[in-house]
């Protein structure tokens, strides 16, 4: 570096630039040092060397500050990785199929419950079933005793048929399956046939008075 013709002008210009780049405390120390340096103007090389050292310190401070700014400006790679993992997990959950255990449980249901379960999904087509009518006690027997009816008919239809044959009101007809229990009028004959048939026949016992219970 070629020393300038006037050490005093170089010191003044460098002093003002360096002082603006420093904090207040550093600026006071710097001004004190410059004041001491002015007392040594006879040694121009010393003054020039001191100013160069001061400038190098300022440059070093700026480099440190720039490095800190760069660190804070870097993207958070961990957060982006976590977000990507969350998206992958949600996609995996959405594609999960029904567990195999569920189908195993359905297959192991009792036979009657399996048929009922299949009917709720797709009702079975109506078929012809055999009904045998057996009178109880002194109730008059009707003919025919064996009927072929549709499986989607209800017990109420059969009660009206018996009432017509006996020439009594429907309220006076009491019907039982195998002399055991009395079905409700809205029950389907096909369902009762599937559960209580004997020798491919559903046996109904009937009378015009209460027989049981």
Curated annotation (Swiss-Prot):
CDD domains: Ubl_ATG12. Keywords: Autophagy, Isopeptide bond, Membrane, Protein transport, Transport, Ubl conjugation pathway. One of its GO terms (molecular function) is Atg8-family ligase activity. GO terms for biological process: autophagosome assembly; autophagosome maturation; autophagy of mitochondrion; glycophagy; piecemeal microautophagy of the nucleus; protein transport. Disulfide bonds: none annotated. It holds the Pfam family APG12. InterPro entries: Atg12, Ubiquitin-like_domsf. Its main location: membrane. It is found in: Preautophagosomal structure membrane. It is a peripheral membrane protein. There is a cross-link at residue 213 (Glycyl lysine isopeptide (Gly-Lys) (interchain with K-125 in ATG5)). The keyword Glycosyltransferase does not apply. The keyword Methyltransferase does not apply. Gene3D superfamilies: Phosphatidylinositol 3-kinase Catalytic Subunit, Chain A, domain 1 (3.10.20.90). One of its GO terms (cellular component) is phagophore assembly site membrane. Forms a conjugate with ATG5. Belongs to the ATG12 family. Ubiquitin-like protein involved in cytoplasm to vacuole transport (Cvt), autophagy vesicles formation, mitophagy, and nucleophagy. Conjugation with ATG5 through a ubiquitin-like conjugating system involving also ATG7 as an E1-like activating enzyme and ATG10 as an E2-like conjugating enzyme, is essential for its function. The ATG12-ATG5 conjugate functions as an E3-like enzyme which is required for lipidation of ATG8 and ATG8 association to the vesicle membranes. This is Ubiquitin-like protein ATG12. It comes from Meyerozyma guilliermondii (strain ATCC 6260 / CBS 566 / DSM 6381 / JCM 1539 / NBRC 10279 / NRRL Y-324) (Yeast). The gene is ATG12.
């Amino acid at each position: 570096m070629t020393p300038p013709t006037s050490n005093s002008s170089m010191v003044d210009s460098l002093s003002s630039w360096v002082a603006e780049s420093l904090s207040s405390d550093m600026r006071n120390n710097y001004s004190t040092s410059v004041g001491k340096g002015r007392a040594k103007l006879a040694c121009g090389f010393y003054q020039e060397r001191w100013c160069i050292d001061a400038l190098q310190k300022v440059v070093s401070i700026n480099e440190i500050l720039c490095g800190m700014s760069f660190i804070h400006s870097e993207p958070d790679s961990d957060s982006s990785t976590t977000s990507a993992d969350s998206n992958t997990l949600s996609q995996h959950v959405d594609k999960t199929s029904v567990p195999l255990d569920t189908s195993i449980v359905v297959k192991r249901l009792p036979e009657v419950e399996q048929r009922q379960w299949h009917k709720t999904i797709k009702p079975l087509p109506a078929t012809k079933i055999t009904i045998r009518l057996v009178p109880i006690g002194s109730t008059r027997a009707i003919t025919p005793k064996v009927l072929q009816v549709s499986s989607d008919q209800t017990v109420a239809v059969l009660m009206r048929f018996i009432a017509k044959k006996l020439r009594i009101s429907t309220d006076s007809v009491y019907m039982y399956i195998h002399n055991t229990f009395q079905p409700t009028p809205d029950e389907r004959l096909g369902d009762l046939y599937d559960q209580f048939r004997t020798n491919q026949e559903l046996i109904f016992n009937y009378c015009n008075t209460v027989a049981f219970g």
